[in-house]
Amino acid sequence: MISPTQFHNSVHNAISGYWGIAAGAMTPSSVVSAHDGSFAAGLLEAVMLLGSEQRPVLLIACDSDYPQPLHDARPVPDTFAVALLLTTMPHPGKTIAQLSFCGDTLFTDAEVQPMDDHALETLRQSIPAARCLPLLQLIARGEAGRVVLDYVNPPRLAVDVAPCS
């Protein structure tokens, strides 16, 4: 028999639930899991919420080593997390990039471009939440361009990035 005390932290929405309780948060939260496409799936859901709710959305993607038997199916060698605050209106001096999602080019069969840095590419491939690294790299460089993110192979998610001044 499985004890509830052994099970309660194994569900993927436990983090969101605990944070909501501790912070007294009354706003909705959504938890998405899509294997290696989880970051892109979360980003897509966050953008849809942003459009429908017309209020800021905090996207948090995180992974840590999975317990058995999940570890055998998808080993995660380290912990990784990223948070993006998405808004519909830029905030001068605070907004660092504009992300665009175009309907006809939102999904693509184009390949994900590997990271130039071998260590970052290894991290990107080995941890689902780290699939955000190409997007973060483009934002950090202050460059405009298109990033292709792992989603469901295929298609992949295409995101256009423009720096804000």
Q: What residues fall within each predicted segment?
A:
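Conserved "HGTGT" condensation-loop signature of ketosynthase/thiolase-family condensing enzymes
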Residues: 2-6, 12, 16-29, 61-165
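Short, conserved micro-motifs enriched in small and acidic residues
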Residues: 10, 36-40, 126
